[in-house]
Amino acid sequence: MASHVDLLTELQLLEKVPTLERLRAAQKRRAQQLKKWAQYEQDLQHRKRKHERKRSTGGRRKKVSFEASVALLEASLRNDAEEVRYFLKNKVSPDLCNEDGLTALHQCCIDNFEEIVKLLLSHGANVNAKDNELWTPLHAAATCGHINLVKILVQYGADLLAVNSDGNMPYDLCEDEPTLDVIETCMAYQGITQEKINEMRAAPEQQMISDIHCMIAAGQDLDWVDAQGATLLHIAGANGYLRAAELLLDHGVRVDVKDWDGWEPLHAAAFWGQMQMAELLVSHGASLSARTSMDEMPIDLCEEEEFKVLLLELKHKHDVIMKSQLRHKSSLSRRTSSAGSRGKVVRRASLSDRTNLYRKEYEGEAILWQQRSASEDQRNSTYNGDIRETRTDQENKDPNPRLEKPVLLSEFPTKIPHSDMDMPVENGLRAPVSTYQYALCNGDVWKVHEVPDYSMAYGNPGVADATPSWSGYKEQSPQTLLELKRQRAAAKLLSHPFLSTHLGSGVSRTGEGSSEGKAPLIGGRTSPYSSNGTSVYYTVTSGDPPLLKFKAPIEEMEEKVHGCCRIS
């Protein structure tokens, strides 16, 4: 049929033609319209018959439907016990799970739906079902602190030693004290010991080590990858299986293999916080600068600050070693022998071997220090023995030796310093006019009288010596420790060198032409002072000795006590 534009054009032309021609054109257009209408009616009847034929045959209707696992989980999430019971009666498995491995029993243990938990367990649900992270329903109930569900799960045989991917058991995750008491009571009732707990924790790693040994024996490639591109070293690194990783590294597996996301084993260890594993991988050449498909380095995947600090230290040490190797390159570095690089030897050593090596070094150092300390103690003991022998000799020596030949005072050197005496004396000594008091080593006071009681020639054999013999002192053996200390203090007082410097201070010059050969001694010695029966003498003309201050009593002082003066 002609279009509308064609009809308008034809009408303009028909106005100019005769009437007969316009009539013929109108009839022609009417015939075309009738033919078009007949065709439309025919098509309409055909569609009606076709629709009636479909209805008579009973065609299926389209509708929305869901998988049984989705429907069961959705009903459990809504706590719809009737619908769950309907699914279970229609032979729907209670162990159906979603893409995360989560079952209806997991979901009900999280939401504390006790009725549906009992319903699922009564229809044979697996009480130890594990999701993708190896969590069991008991893990979920213990973590949430649902003590009623924990009791039900234990009654149906829940595994108290089930270990998830993080190496945690249900009692490790439980923070609710009553729930934890129930779990520990059940563990004690089942006879679970710490040895069993440690054995169960190490079971996954031990199984992996066994599988690796089987692969080695069969000659299989240890760099085998799974559907996600992960190798055995990826798995060991993510789970922290140190022994399995050391076994793989000892057999030369690559540490730079990437999975489909561009992750190396070091990335996995960093993401899951396996610090020792990261140190092991770095020591075997893993790169701390490796990047994933998302342009992430291992340190970017860490969540713990302590782990980040460790990785930064490892990176710094690695950079220092590389710079030192580049700086100290020599002809020896081009050798192919094993002595070419010590860093390679350390890098290929296992963590346990290096720990044993450090322990041996510490033991050797401790032995060396013990030997050095023993030698120092021996030297000190020898030195102390010599000091004791010297002290014993000094104590046994007579502090007042007798002159074999009588010696007068005039025989001593006459050129001596000027003294502070009130009046000079010739060839002798005199006591000062004033009275002096001297503090001795035991706190007593020694008085020197103004007028001497007697005078005698120094060393005159005709006059009885006022000094008692040292043998008499030795015969008076000490009976107590106090007396022994006092005797030692008295002996050291006599042997102190300070006395010899004051001996001639009170002696005046004598005339060279003196006719007297006498050597009178005026107050040459004081009356004896005795601390424990032993006489001790002091020459009064030795000048004014300094006043020595000592602490009393003598028992509280050390043995190193010095007297105020000495007779030479």
From Swiss-Prot:
PROSITE patterns: ANK_REP_REGION, ANK_REPEAT. It is found in: Cell membrane; Nucleus; Cell projection. Keywords: ANK repeat, Cell membrane, Cell projection, Coiled coil, Lipoprotein, Membrane, Methylation, Nucleus, Palmitate, Phosphoprotein, Prenylation, Repeat. The modification Phosphoserine is found at residues 69, 333, 337, 350, 477. Residues 327-346, 373-404, 504-525 are annotated as: Disordered. Induction: Inhibited by TGF-beta1. Down-regulated by LPS. Phosphorylated by PKA and, after PKA priming, by GSK3B. Phosphorylation by GSK3B reduces its association with PP1C and enhances PP1C activity. Dephosphorylation by its associated PP1C results in enhanced association with PP1C, but reduced PP1C activity. Residues 566-568 form a propeptide. It holds the Pfam family Ank_2. Residues 333-342 have a biased composition (Low complexity). GO terms for molecular function: enzyme inhibitor activity; myosin phosphatase regulator activity. It comes from the Eukaryota. This is Protein phosphatase 1 regulatory inhibitor subunit 16B. It comes from Bos taurus (Bovine). The lineage of its organism: Eukaryota, Metazoa, Chordata, Craniata, Vertebrata. The gene is PPP1R16B.
